[in-house]
Regions:
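N-terminal Sec/SRP start-transfer signal
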Residues: 1-30, 483, 571-612, 892, ...
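Membrane transport/envelope proteins' first extracytoplasmic loop
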Residues: 3-444, 456, 630, 634-643, ...
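Interfacial "coupling" helices/loops that link adjacent transmembrane helices in transporter permeases
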Residues: 6, 14, 448-487, 884-925
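Short, strongly hydrophobic transmembrane alpha-helices
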Residues: 15-41, 57-59, 487, 601-626, ...
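Small-residue-rich transmembrane alpha-helices
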Residues: 451-456, 461-463, 487-519, 528-555, ...
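Short cytosolic juxtamembrane segments of multi-pass membrane proteins
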Residues: 555-573, 983-998
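Juxtamembrane segments of multi-pass membrane proteins
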Residues: 587-741, 748, 760
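C-terminal transmembrane helical bundles of large multi-pass transporters
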Residues: 808, 822-824, 841-949, 953-962, ...
Length: 998
């Protein structure tokens, strides 16, 4: 009992050490669990939402549309739970200039169901539900009416129907109808599209370069009132996928098994069958056209023959009348009846032989008959020409049919192809990667501080330990005094850390996340396993340090332990050998210098602890500086143009004419811009089209006219990149790249994420969904977005081959050779404000789809989630620095109580004692700061390079001010700790302290 009371008394006396260990454990466990828990809560809530709304696991698209046979074949694939055929329609409407929307049918199979936020779901024709983004951008509300106009080419495959005459959806007659929605609409509800969780009312600008939407808005309508049998895609749910977390590898493996089956069995057969359907439909159309033409020609020929017969009868009548009159005259003048009969016979005989001559004479003598004969001959000639021309045309179409219908391509995509899904996943993954790295530093510092604190605690009880061992107490029992002390401190600190880690930090992160994404049903959850492991990790580390400290002392005999420990012997230091410097240092300065290097363990612990905390602060500030400079570097340094304007192909000429003629435009470059995908060649079958796989990146494909290739360098800084461990890729690299016809130039952001370099082979998917293998000629410096530059000639080489032509663009060779330059890069005069205003005014023009001002993008770009995490990390690192300095300062004082007492006996004033002790701590702190600044730069560079976020490349930037802030903050913490330590020095009793050894 006395042993226990003494142990509790010792614990109460060492409350400062207890608080230090508990605080370090609290911070470490909070960092270890907090960022993880915040990301996990977001992952789980989003996964539950996706399962509830039936977000598709797989999407199948085809360059020739999907038929009922395709849908039936997909349903038979092993592992497919549900299949839903999609038939959207693109429409336009007037909202501050022309805006576009996708009319989406609310499926009946429970796939991709919108989440109702206000009002009710549409039930009958003419009712729609809209997204909150549309409500925000317009003055519409529930009950408002809207009129839309279908686009002329709203579907990729509707043109296929016009060109080839069939889509194959109706296999009995080979005819299709493009989707058609009501145009007079009434808003009855506000919904959230599960395919896009971006918060329209949020404060993030990330959507400016991550959005993959081809229209401005999405409207949801019921099946009532929707007509058409043309399917543009099919969405699938996979059996067992809902039971897995959509963000886990197990989910990806489950879905991959189904996509592999589709690729390996259904796709090839249905691609061939679909093309054959189109060929059969085309041949049937030609056969029907020939039959119809033959019928019309036969009718026309019958009409001509009837008219000619009537004409001949009229002429024959005239001939007969003239012949009869001649015979009658001869009979009247004849001598006898025999002579008359002979004359009649002769006349008839002459009529048979000279009938044609007489016909021609009669026709020639009559203008009416002449005109009638000419009309008949002309009609016959025209009919013959039409028959020959039609037959030639049909023969040509028969010969061209096989070449005009390309090979059908299926593209099998998973959820990664959804821009909103991939953006959320990449954001959370990047934050989680930071959360996995920083706790390591906290754990190392916790072990170091625990070793320092517990070693001093054991050393202070050295004589007491010897007494207990001498009295017969086992070494384990004696060591339990300190092990239980450390364990209790860890458990209390860890428990508080779990509260902060599973409640405080996640709540903070989720508030920031909800400013970027809409995540219904978000709730905080506790993970017993991870929480227990988090505490256990720090308990093991701290107890290991405590055991080491106990073993170091208890290996001695009780008699040796009960005697005072001999003071550490002094030694000459390097500075003493530099006589000119050493001789000019005062006495106290020399004592300080010797003390610093005399206690090497304290030197290592202090410098290491301070360096670690400083490095964490620098690392956090480095990430903040890197993100803060992304917009400026991209939109003011890399992009030399001031304005990018994009239009539909049909409005391209009008847009270019309008912009080029404006006086504010000083120079411009016509280009073609398409949204596409970049996939590492060899990561999968080129035909599989898995644009959403881990080896894929959404890109902006920029085609440049052949005659203006040299002008691209004036609009975009094409700078080759280099990379290093510090993440300074592209910095200091000289020279510029030239776009040629031998390959494409890939943006650094995409190249870094995919591991692509110059000479690599990649699979490019253009705006029409056509894939081709391309060579990477160079990688250019690019931080935001993923641009791929290609020359006009190389673009044609990639996508205009027979196998690459999309059915949508199945045109004559003359039409397919030229690209439509649907975008313009322009340099503007005037201030940033005037350039932004000009871009906004252009967006109101009906010929402009999008106008982007680089000045506006540079000023408005921000990455709020990363900024919030950086602020959290810096705050926690600052707290850790404060605890570390407090622990080291108290340990330093407890080690040197007799030394301080001696100074007081010698007549030192309190202020001089403060200065004597604090000077050593400040010097050690400065040494730790000097070591921590470059260490933080190194760690920050390694962490930011490891993020690999889609459409972003972190070119590490640490501003001088950040180094100053980190150094000043650490020094400020050191000064703050001194304010707490100085009263302790004042309370030292010289007499009792000097007699403590006795």
């Amino acid at each position: 009992m006395a042993f226990v009371k003494d142990m509790l008394r010792m614990w109460a006396h060492s409350w400062k050490r207890f608080i230090s260990i508990a605080m370090i454990t609290l911070l470490g466990v909070a960092v270890l669990t907090g960022i993880y828990a915040g990301c996990r809560d977001a992952f789980r809530s989003t996964d539950r939402f996706f399962d509830a709304q039936g977000l598709h696991d797989v999407q199948v698209l085809s360059t020739a549309g999907l038929s009922n046979g395709d849908i039936a074949a997909l349903r038979k694939v092993n592992g497919v739970a549900k299949v839903q055929a999609e038939r959207p329609q693109e429409v336009t409407f007037d909202l501050d200039g022309r805006k576009s929307a996708t009319m989406q049918e609310i499926g009946t199979n429970g796939i991709d169901q919108p989440y109702l936020q206000e009002g009710r779901m549409p039930k009958k024709a003419g009712e729609i539900a809209v997204t909150r983004k549309f409500i925000r951008d317009s003055d519409k509300r529930i009950g408002s009416r809207l009129t839309v106009t279908p686009e002329s080419a709203s579907s990729d495959t509707s043109d296929t129907n016009d060109t080839n005459g069939a889509d194959g959806t109706n296999e009995t007659n080979g005819t299709d109808e493009a989707p058609s929605f009501p145009t007079k609409l009434t808003i009855v509800g506000v919904v959230l599209d599960p395919q896009n969780l971006s918060n329209p009312d949020g404060y993030s600008a990330m959507t400016s370069f991550r959005s993959t939407a081809t229209t401005d808005y999405t409207f949801f309508a019921p099946s009532d009132g929707v007509t058409g049998t043309l399917y543009t895609s099919a969405t699938l749910l996979v059996k067992g996928a809902a039971a897995e977390s959509t963000f886990d590898e197990s989910y990806e493996n489950t879905v991959k098994q189904v996509t592999d089956r589709i690729d390996g069995t259904v796709k090839t057969d249905r691609q061939k069958a679909r093309r054959q359907e189109l060929l059969d439909a085309g041949n049937k159309k030609i056969a029907d056209a020939r039959a119809e033409a033959d019928k019309k020609f036969a009718d026309a020929q019958s009409q001509i023959d009837a008219n000619r017969q009537q004409f001949n009868q009229q002429v024959d009548q005239i001939v007969s009348m003239q012949a009869g009159a001649a015979a009658a005259g001869a009979a009247a003048n004849g001598a006898n009846a025999g002579a008359a009969a002979a004359a009649g016979a002769t006349t008839l005989q002459l009529d048979e032989t000279t009938r044609e001559t007489m016909r021609e004479t009669i026709i020639a003598a009559s203008p009416e008959l002449t005109q009638a004969k000419q009309q008949l001959d002309q009609a016959q000639s025209q009919l013959n020409e039409q028959k020959a021309s039609t037959e030639h045309t049909l023969k040509t179409k028969e010969n061209e049919l096989k070449t005009s219908i390309p090979q059908v391509r299926w593209y099998v995509q998973d959820r990664q192809s959804l821009g909103g899904f991939s953006a959320l996943k990449s954001d959370l993954d990047s934050i989680q990667s930071l959360g996995n790295a920083f706790p390591i530093v906290f754990l190392l510092v916790a072990v170091m501080m625990s070793l320092t604190a517990m070693a001093r605690m054991v050393e202070e009880d050295r004589s007491l330990i010897g007494t207990y061992v001498g009295l017969g107490y086992g070494r384990l029992a004696v060591a339990s005094r300190y092990l239980l002390f450390a364990l209790l401190a860890c458990l209390i600190g860890g428990g508080l850390g779990l509260i902060a880690g599973f409640l405080g930090i996640p709540a903070f992160l989720l508030v920031v996340l909800q400013g970027m994404y809409v995540m219904p049903g978000l709730r905080l959850e506790y993970d017993w396993l991870y929480g227990s492991l988090g505490i256990a990790l720090f308990v093991v580390g701290v107890l290991a340090a405590t055991i080491y400290a106990c073993v170091q002392e208890m290996r001695q005999t009780p008699a040796a332990l009960m005697r005072p420990k001999a003071p550490r012997a002094g030694s000459r230091i390097l500075l003493e050998r530099i006589r000119p410097v050493w001789n000019r240092i005062g006495f106290l300065g020399k004592v300080t210098a010797r003390n610093i290097f005399r206690f090497k363990s304290r030197l290592i612990m202090t410098v290491g602890g301070v360096a670690g905390c400083t490095a964490l602060i620098v690392c956090g500030l480095a990430i903040n500086d890197t993100v803060a400079d992304l917009g400026i570097k991209q939109y003011r340094d890399i992009y030399q143009y001031d304005l990018m304007v994009v239009s539909d192909d049909s409005d391209a000429l009008a847009m270019r004419t309008k912009v080029a003629s404006d006086g504010r435009v000083t120079s411009s470059l016509d280009v073609r811009i398409e949204s596409g995908d970049l996939t590492v060649a060899g990561s999968g079958d080129g035909d599989s089209g898995k644009a959403g796989s881990s080896g894929s990146e959404s890109i902006q494909l920029v085609a440049v006219p052949e005659k203006h290739l040299s002008d691209l360098g004036e609009m975009v800084t094409l700078q080759p990149v280099s990379s290093g461990i510090l993440g300074t890729s592209g910095v200091g690299k000289t020279g510029s790249l030239k776009l040629d016809d031998d390959g494409v130039i890939v943006a650094q952001s995409a190249a870094s994420a995919l591991g692509v370099k110059a000479g690599s082979k990649v699979r490019l998917t253009n705006g029409d969904g056509v894939q081709a293998t391309a060579k990477v000629s160079a990688v250019n410096r690019n931080l935001i977005g993923s641009d791929v530059y290609v020359s006009e000639t190389y673009y044609a080489k990639l996508f205009d081959s027979k196998d690459a032509k999309n059915t949508k663009n199945s045109k004559s060779s003359e039409d397919s050779e030229a690209l439509t330059w649907n975008a313009m890069l322009a340099k503007l005069s005037g201030s940033d404000t005037s350039q932004t205003d000009y871009a906004e005014s252009l967006e109101e023009d009906s010929s402009v789809m999008k106008a982007v001002s680089c000045a506006h993008m540079a000023d408005s770009f921000k990455f709020d989630l990363m900024g919030a995490v950086v602020a959290l990390i810096v705050a926690l690192a600052g707290g850790l620095a404060l605890v570390v300095l407090f622990t080291l300062a108290n340990t330093n004082v407890s080690e040197r109580v007799r030394e301080m007492a001696t100074l007081k006996v010698l007549g030192f004033f309190d202020r001089e004692v403060h200065h004597y002790v604090n000077r050593e701590m400040m010097i050690l702190t400065v040494m730790g700061v000097i070591l921590g600044l470059p260490l933080g730069r190194l760690v920050g560079g390694m962490l930011t390079m490891a993020l690999n976020m889609p459409s972003l490349y972190f070119e590490v930037e640490v501003k001088p001010l950040s180094y100053v802030i980190a150094a000043v903050a650490t020094m400020a913490f050191a000064l703050l700790v001194q304010l707490f330590v100085n009263p302790v020095l004042d309370r030292i009793d010289p007499i009792s302290s000097l007699k403590s050894v006795e």
